A protein has these predicted regions:
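Secretory pathway targeting signatures of secreted, lumenal, and periplasmic proteins
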Residues: 2-69
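Short, solvent-exposed coil/turn segments at beta-strand boundaries
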Residues: 14-17, 44-46, 95-97, 120-126, ...
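Surface-exposed amphipathic alpha-helical segments
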Residues: 19, 127-166
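Short hydrophobic/aromatic-rich beta-strand segments that constitute the beta-sheet cores
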Residues: 21, 51, 101-102, 115, ...
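Short, flexible beta-strand-to-coil junctions
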Residues: 45-47, 54-58, 108, 122-123, ...
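Signature of long, low-cysteine stretches enriched in small and polar/charged residues
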Residues: 61, 65-122, 164-166
Length: 166
């Protein structure tokens, strides 16, 4: 297991050694040519599992919502725009005073895609850690994602402010 710092030092997560950094070409294939590419994208090429992190502070409506409402909003948007979308549940996780929501879903495009989205809100910024497994034969997708979610450790706010001033 390797320890990775995500969301600009807000949290760290343990990820199995089978994951490797995605190349620019792989990122373009996943996210398209016209979007800003996320810095953090890891792939387990053998099992076709992807982990990525993104931040957004552009959507004004999300800034006013609490974490559960954001997860429900994301689920609603996916339901209206993604064919074959199904939500398996929205869960809440608390780590000391930090709270995040976890959204388990699957949908069908060319292949069945299983996803786990961990949503964390800090002031006006929404942080998203998303895991996607595109191999329908991998029945262990839920435990793989669960282990990643359980390994997330939020850094104390004092440490984060110290990092920002250096």
């Amino acid at each position: 297991m390797k320890q990775y710092v995500i969301w600009k030092g807000i949290a760290s997560v343990e990820i199995p050694d089978s994951f490797q950094a995605a190349t620019i070409g792989e990122k373009r294939k996943i996210f398209g040519n016209y979007r800003k590419l996320p810095d953090f994208v890891l792939l387990d090429r053998q099992h076709r599992i992807r982990i990525s992190c993104v931040d957004t502070d552009r959507i004004e409506k999300l800034k006013k919502m609490d974490i559960e409402q954001i997860a429900q909003f994301m689920s609603h948007i996916y339901k209206r725009t993604v064919p074959g979308y199904r939500c398996h549940g929205i869960y809440k996780r608390a780590d000391d005073d930090e709270v995040c929501a976890i959204l388990y879903t699957h949908y069908i495009l060319n292949d069945t895609l299983y996803t786990m989205s961990l949503i964390y809100k800090e002031q006006d910024t929404i942080h998203l850690l998303q895991c996607t497994c595109s191999n329908a034969d991998t029945v262990e997708w839920h435990p793989v994602f669960k282990n990643i979610v359980e390994s997330i450790c939020f850094n104390k706010k004092e440490k984060r402010h110290d990092k920002g001033t250096m």
